[in-house]
Amino acid sequence: FTAREDDEILISISFEAPSGGYAYEKQKRKIGDYATAAAGVIIKVENNKCSSASIALTNLSDTPVYCDKAVDIIVGKEIDKNLLDQVTKACVDQSDPVADQRGPVEFKKYVAGIVIKKALNRAIERS
C-alpha cells in the first residue's frame, strides 16, 4: 500500500544495503532457458552463527517464494550440516511447483534442494 496520489510520481527509494554473503543459484536445461529451479540467499554469519538471513525461490511456484520458515530455523543458530539440511527441507516444503516441460513435481523438488544447498553454502562462504 502507498499513499501516492494520482498526480504524484515516485522519484526515489532509500534503504540500507544488506551486509553479509549472497548467492543466486539456478538449474536450467540450456543457455537462455528458464530455470527449472532457482534460489537466492543473503546471509550474515558472525562467530559461525547466523545473525540474519533472507532466502527466496523462483520457478518453484506461481509466484516467488520467500522462505520465512527456513529463515526462522537458521537465524540465531550455529551453522553446521544438520542445520543446512533442515533449512533446505523447510525451503523445499514451502515450494509448490507444477509439472511442465521442465519436469514433474518430484524432479523439481529434488532440483530445488540442490540449488538451495548450493546457494546457502556459497552465501555462507562469502559472508
Briefly describe each language-model feature range.
Residues 1-127:
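C-terminal structural segment of proteins
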